[in-house]
């Protein structure tokens, strides 16, 4: 019975992770199609991450007042409306659509990470694997629809609008997988005098800031720097990691960019699914390894020291492995090391870190990609301006 419940817990949270992150991934995969080759892809990243970061940053001060049951319809509405606007391919409608989808993704990550406090390690491994699965399913399905099947880009994006309805499975949790003890925890009134929710309400903003400050060195800095380095690669450098199209297996240069995204997400999926089997206590190891990857890709973009796309594809895949491992180990360490009375708060709060690193990368990438592209054009490599 316990084993069966564990399997269902994993399955439900895998789906929640998949759906929560898939639109974020699809939007990044479609960056070159949304804004074209002449603008930095980091503009899309900026709009895809800024709202998510802001809601995560402010959530510790208000999220306790919204019951989990009420959060799900909000996530569904924001996601569906967001991707519908993005599918119009009109830049001035796409950007607000990206903002709505980003709000849903950030609020969803807080919600489901906090729920893992009640459901334990199986829910966290399911969520982590599902978010990794969102990467590979989102990027590969978009690659398949637009590059292999050559489906209309507007229709391809619109097909994703129905996926957020899968969040409705949340309402089956109590009937399917929750023991009576967890059931009581989830269904208690939001203003109950028990548990971490009331502790949060009774503390002032100063106390909340103090609690957040304790998370900076062990969890937030290593996670945010890993995301900073990998998204600088993905959005600032990868669009310039190009080769003569006749030396590659691709038809268009935008196909190279989409393929890089798919390889990265494959690495993320593998490490988020199985990374917990190789536990790492010192999270700064991942920061160092990802910095090395950034330096290697920067040198390739600037100096063009190899004319083999295969080596770069392997490196992008490895970059994804590092990023996914950092994420799953960070939250696994929290489940193991943090006091249960603080765990729900910590799980929701540390998710600020990945968005912060990605947000900084978006700002830097807006400068970095055009600079690298300008240098390449000046040295006889004009591919970054070609479709």
From Swiss-Prot:
It is found in: Vacuole membrane. Its main location: membrane. One of its GO terms (cellular component) is vacuolar membrane. The chain crosses the membrane at residues 43-63, 72-92, 93-113, 129-149, 151-171, 225-245, 257-276, 278-298, 308-328, 347-367. Residues 1-31 form the signal peptide. The keyword Membrane applies. Belongs to the battenin family. PANTHER family: BATTENIN. This is Protein BTN1.
